[in-house]
Amino acid sequence: MIDTIAIIGAGLAGSTAARALRAQGYEGRIHLLGDESHQAYDRTTLSKTVLAGEQPEPPAILDSAWYASAHVDVQLGRRVSCLDLANRQIQFESGAPLAYDRLLLATGARARRMAIRGGDLAGIHTLRDLADSQALRQALQPGQSLVIVGGGLIGCEVATTARKLSVHVTILEAGDELLVRVLGHRTGAWCRAELERMGVRVERNAQAARFEGQGQVRAVICADGRRVPADVVLVSIGAEPADELARAAGIACARGVLVDATGATSCPEVFAAGDVAAWPLRQGGQRSLETYLNSQMEAEIAASAMLSQPVPAPQVPTSWTEIAGHRIQMIGDAEGPGEIVVRGDAQSGQPIVLLRLLDGCVEAATAINATREFSVATRLVGTRVSVSAEQLQDVGSNLRDLLKAKPN
C-alpha cells in the first residue's frame, strides 16, 4: 500500500510528477519539498524575456491554486539534511522527520563554477534561478561589455538578449565551435554566423584562465594570453547534478543519480527525475539530459512507475532554443554516427531541417524556423521508419508521407 509519496525538489520535475500522480488517480498523501522560496516556474525564460525585462517574473509551471485543490502539501524553504533509507524517512535541518512509502528525487542541478584566480571578483555571474537572472539584468547596462565564458545554449541565449539591451557581447568558447554538444558542428557554425551578424564577438579555442580586476572584474585572461575587457562576466559552462543527498545515502550515482528506464534508482523505493538523474538513452549510454521537455517526460515516467503503471521506451534528448531571432528545435544527438541530410535552403529563406540518417533511420533532427517539419521529424525519430537521403532532401515532398514506410 502506497500511502505517502514524498518529492524532494519543487521545481519543474517535482511539480510535474505531483500533477501526474493525481492525474493517474493516486489519492494518497503527496509532500512536495523545496529549498527555494518560489513555487515551480519556467526557467527557460530566465535567459530570454525575464533577462530582457519583458517579464518581471517567469510564468508558473502550475497555478498556485492547483496545489491546494489537489491536496498536495507544498513545503518551500525546507532544507533536507539526509535520507534514512532503512526507515524510509527524510531528515530535515530542523523539525521532525517525514516518513514515505515512495520517494522521488528531483533536486535538479546547480551552475558549474570556475575554480580559477579571480573567481570571487564582483561582477561575475552564473544563471540558474530567478535571483541569478534578476542580478544579471541589473548589472547589464547599455554600452557595457559582457563576456560570456561558454558557448552553449544558455550562453548563446544570453548573448542574444544582451545585444537587444545594447550591451557589447563577447563569447569565449573553449572548443572549436559553439553549441556542438546540442546542435552539432554544422548548426553551431550557422548559429555563430547569425550571432556575429547581431554584433556578438565570438572567440573560439579560448580557454578562460583567470579573471582580472581589483574587487570588480575588469577582464578575462585566456590561456593563450588573450585579454578580453569585461564590465560583467557570465560563466556558462554547464551544470552539476545536485546529487549529494543520494550519494550520502549510498544510492548509485555517476554524474547524477543513476536510474533505469522507469526512473528507479539502486534503492527500490527511491526514484529520480529531472536534471539530477542520469537516464538510459535509446542509442545507449546514460546521462542527465538537462532539458525542459525531458524533465517533464522523466517526471511523468517516474510517477507512473511509482504506481506500477506501464512506462514508455527509453528517451531521446529533446529541446528547443531561441538564438539570434531564430527558433531552433532538436531531438536526438546531432553529432552521432551517420549522414547529415539537409532539407531546405537558408539562402532562400526556407525553413531548414537537418536530419542524421543512420542505416536508413532518422536518429536525430534539428529544425531552424521549421516548427511544422520538426513535429514530423520527431515522429520519424520515434517510429524508426525506413527512409532515404533523397526522400528527406526533396522539399517538394511531404515529410508526413514518409511515416507510412515500414519500420526498419
Curated annotation (Swiss-Prot):
This dioxygenase system consists of four proteins: the two subunits of the hydroxylase component (BphA and BphE), a ferredoxin (BphF) and a ferredoxin reductase (BphG). It holds the Pfam family Pyr_redox_2. This is Biphenyl dioxygenase system ferredoxin--NAD(+) reductase component. Pathway: Xenobiotic degradation; biphenyl degradation. GO terms for molecular function: ferredoxin-NAD+ reductase activity; oxidoreductase activity, acting on NAD(P)H. InterPro entries: FAD-oxidoreductase/Apoptosis, FAD/NAD-bd_sf, FAD/NAD-binding_dom, FAD/NAD-linked_Rdtase_dimer_sf, Reductase_C. FAD binds at residues 4-35. NAD(+) binds at residues 145-173. GO terms for biological process: catabolic process. One of its GO terms (cellular component) is cytoplasm. Its cofactor is FAD. Part of the electron transfer component of biphenyl dioxygenase, transfers electrons from ferredoxin (BphF) to NADH. Coiled coil: none annotated. Keywords: Aromatic hydrocarbons catabolism, FAD, Flavoprotein, NAD, Oxidoreductase. It catalyses: 2 reduced [2Fe-2S]-[ferredoxin] + NAD(+) + H(+) = 2 oxidized [2Fe-2S]-[ferredoxin] + NADH. The keyword Kinase does not apply. The keyword RNA-binding does not apply. Its EC number is 1.18.1.3. It is an enzyme of class 1 (oxidoreductase). Belongs to the bacterial ring-hydroxylating dioxygenase ferredoxin reductase family.
